[in-house]
Amino acid sequence: MIYGILSHVPKIFFKPAYDLYERYLLEKVKAGVLPKHVAIIMDGNRRWAKKREKPPWYGHLFGSKKLEEILEWCHELGIRILTVYAFSTENFKRSKEEVERLMQLFEQKFRELVTDKRVHEYGVRVNVIGRKELLPKSVRDAAEEAERATRKYNNYVLNVAIAYGGRSEIVDAVKDIVRDVMDGKLRVEDIDEELLKKYLYVPNMPDPDIVIRTGGEVRISNFLLYQIAYSELFFVDVYFPEFRKIDFLRIIREFQKRERRFGR
């Protein structure tokens, strides 16, 4: 009965309590050990759009806006590295219209990054990781322009995984190592886990402390397979466009309570 009454109360009446709880969580999180690297599988854009009887691109558009919010949250907390899974190699199998819309959105967002005042004010370096040769030339050009425009920055790092697959990344790294062995630049005896890291799409990047997947699915979907061996995994039910700051803070708070053993 009480739930039935509360469900008819306008949400605006709960906002002061919500804001108070968010500030409380923020203070708790800031007082603890913060992750250096957060990775996100941005899942649920299409289902979020379908729930609203909108086409898939509508969900992807709102997903891109959510990513901008998350960048602000990371800046506020001092989380230096954010890696997001935007488009897998398997996603090319989606409908032609959806893929074309997504490519247009990627191109637009990369070009916006070049002139975004926050990117330059915060010192955000942009890396686009994946098999970029699979992307349309206009998207590749826009991605490379964003990388060039931010190459000198090192305060924060945004890795955008597009046309990406974790297995493909490992295969590409192994191919490069084999070439260097054949060219006499490396000895077989030199090959170890640390050397392989130097051949990944972003060489020597610290492994993610946290991996978050939105959308309710409990799987990794070929994301950063080499890098997440000891990452803390969090799966949340909300679709990516609905992912709130309070959800983000709760995850980090839970991360701070866990004992990381790194296989020991």
From Swiss-Prot:
The active site lies at: 43, 91
Instruction: Tell me its EC number(s), please.
Output: 2.5.1.89
How does the cofactor attach, per the note? Binds 2 magnesium ions per subunit.
Cited InterPro entries: UPP_synth-like, UPP_synth-like_CS, UPP_synth-like_sf
Cofactors named for this entry: Mg(2+)
What UniProt keywords are attached to this protein's entry? Magnesium, Metal-binding, Transferase
Source superkingdom: Archaea
Entry's Gene Ontology molecular function annotations: ditrans,polycis-polyprenyl diphosphate synthase [(2E,6E)-farnesyl diphosphate specific] activity; magnesium ion binding
Q: Which GO terms describe its biological process?
A: polyprenol biosynthetic process
Give the residues the record marks as binding Mg(2+).
43, 232
Chain positions recorded as substrate binding sites: 44-48, 60, 88-90, 92, 94, 213, 219-221
Assembly mode: Homodimer.
Instruction: State the function annotated in the UniProt record.
Output: Catalyzes the sequential condensation of isopentenyl diphosphate (IPP) with geranylgeranyl diphosphate (GGPP) to yield (2Z,6Z,10Z,14Z,18Z,22Z,26Z,30E,34E,38E)-undecaprenyl diphosphate (tritrans,heptacis-UPP). It is probably the precursor of glycosyl carrier lipids.
Q: Which family does it belong to?
A: Belongs to the UPP synthase family.
* UniProt-recorded name of the protein: Tritrans,polycis-undecaprenyl-diphosphate synthase (geranylgeranyl-diphosphate specific)
Species annotation: Pyrococcus abyssi (strain GE5 / Orsay)
Q: Which gene encodes it?
A: uppS
